[in-house]
Amino acid sequence: TNLYGCNAAKAADIDGDGDVDIFASVFLPYIRKETPGSEFTESLIWMEQVEPGRFERYSLEKMTCFHPTLDLGDFDNDGDVDLVVGNMTMAKRKEDTLAHWAVLWKNKRR
């Protein structure tokens, strides 16, 4: 699959079905909210493996392409895999940054 500007990707069994799924994030700091077409630019996706070697793509976020890193782990200690995404928080233009250094996406599966 194509993900323009993909800067980080991690694999784990995110949905608890025994196979490996993928999260991927985008870092394109020059894409701004006022850039034509930016509202369609995916910045965070989940690739669910539905059968061996076949993935379904889910867009979790668009138009926020300021993620230089991501990681997976059980950050809330509930037994499933959560996602934390690092954000660019310093730039020349305040509107080209995100407010928080990192954002935790809790897995609501349990």
Task: Say what each PLM segment does.
Residues 1-110:
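Beta-propeller-forming repeat regions
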